[in-house]
């Protein structure tokens, strides 16, 4: 009986090898492989969102590259601000970014205040939804762009709708456009390691008795193809005296294919400045016991950095290197990806480079 089982297994192995050889001959080497070999398994490369709390909520330290991301929420909730912060973070890593401004409403001076280098950002203001998605497809296929933002799905108007009369009924046209585009884009996005962020708006479904009446525009395709979906909401207003200086914001990770979903993050968005990263570093640094808080004073490594949250936040803003050092210690304590330091590399990358340099010099790396 054992001989029969062995023979059957041997026949199956031969049949499998023949099938694999036929597939590789027809479609090219590397078309199919075992999951544990080659480059099939690799660490997820991420880009920080500009918010430490949101990076932690995402579970991997930021938004994953080579994936489709959807960010949606009500009007003036911080959707474009969040994506501009991600562009600024990608530029810090030396990445090339493109912004498809279908809404024709990008405020370039505000983007500059958030740290975006306008000279290094590609921008397009397309006339139709088809044109916008063709531009995205061309940029992704080039392999030279690291991140593309589409603002917004709701503004991707099909050509037939633009050329038709006002009031024409064209049901499902935008949903079909998005479905076709995402079918074409997904595989190329993965191969070129390009992150594509779609900003989306909220609509209300009529006649919903149970559950949430809210839905996003553009049909269901984006919900399926997106690896990460973020629901961003404004929860309150930050005031200095009687003057409003920012918004309190809450983000829920509604879908996450790279880590457990449904985690939330809360942070402040200050008008004209963007996400208050230093405030988050203070709060999480204290929680992780990396910063000491005694009364109103904040201290790091026994040295006082400010009395009161506002003063300590201002100190970290003026000393960005120290802020990155503290943030990386918080990230390390939580086991998520570290930020690049002033030299452009995360600490573990610097260590690897140092090891390689020593190997080149000595011919061997000491254990």
UniProtKB/Swiss-Prot annotation:
ATP binds at residues 73-80. It comes from Delftia acidovorans (strain DSM 14801 / SPH-1). HAMAP family: RecA. The gene is recA. Pfam families: RecA, RecA_C. GO terms for cellular component: cytosol. This is Protein RecA. Keywords: ATP-binding, Cytoplasm, DNA damage, DNA recombination, DNA repair, DNA-binding, Nucleotide-binding, SOS response. It comes from the Bacteria. The keyword Transferase does not apply.
């Amino acid at each position: 009986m054992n001989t029969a089982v062995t023979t059957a297994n041997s026949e199956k192995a031969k049949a499998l090898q023949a099938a694999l050889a036929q597939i590789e001959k027809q479609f090219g080497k590397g078309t199919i492989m075992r999951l544990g070999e080659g480059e099939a398994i690799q660490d997820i490369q991420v880009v920080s969102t500009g918010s430490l709390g949101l990076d932690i909520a995402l579970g991997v330290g930021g938004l994953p590259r080579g994936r489709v991301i959807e960010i949606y929420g009500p009007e003036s909730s911080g959707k474009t601000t969040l994506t501009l912060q991600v562009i600024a973070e990608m530029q810090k890593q030396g990445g090339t970014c493109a912004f498809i401004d279908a809404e024709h409403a990008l405020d370039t001076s505000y983007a500059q205040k958030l740290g975006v280098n306008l000279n290094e950002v590609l921008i397009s203001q397309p006339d139709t939804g088809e044109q916008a998605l063709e531009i995205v497809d061309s940029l992704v296929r080039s392999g030279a762009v690291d991140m593309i933002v589409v603002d917004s799905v709701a503004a991707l108007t099909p050509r037939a709708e633009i050329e038709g009369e006002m009031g024409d009924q064209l049901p499902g046209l935008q949903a079909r456009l998005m479905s076709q585009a995402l079918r074409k884009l997904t595989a190329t996005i993965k191969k070129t390691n390009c992150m594509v962020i779609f900003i989306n708006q909220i609509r209300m479904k009529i006649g919903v008795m149970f559950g949430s009446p809210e839905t996003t525009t553009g049909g269901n395709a984006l919900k399926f193809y997106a690896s990460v979906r973020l629901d961003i909401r404004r929860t309150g207003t930050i005031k200095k005296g009687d003057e409003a200086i920012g918004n309190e914001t809450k983000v829920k990770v509604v879908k996450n294919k790279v880590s457990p979903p449904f985690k939330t993050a809360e942070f402040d968005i200050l008008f004209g400045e963007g996400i208050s990263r230093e405030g988050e570093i203070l709060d999480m640094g204290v929680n992780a016991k990396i910063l000491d808080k005694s009364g109103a004073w904040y201290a790091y490594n026994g040295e006082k950095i400010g009395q009161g949250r506002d003063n300590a936040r201002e100190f970290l803003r003026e000393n960005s290197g120290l802020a990155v050092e503290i943030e990386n210690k918080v990230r390390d304590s939580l086991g998520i990806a570290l930020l690049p330091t002033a030299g452009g590399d995360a600490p573990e990358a610097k260590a690897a480079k140092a090891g390689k340099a020593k190997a080149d010099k000595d011919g061997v790396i000491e254990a």
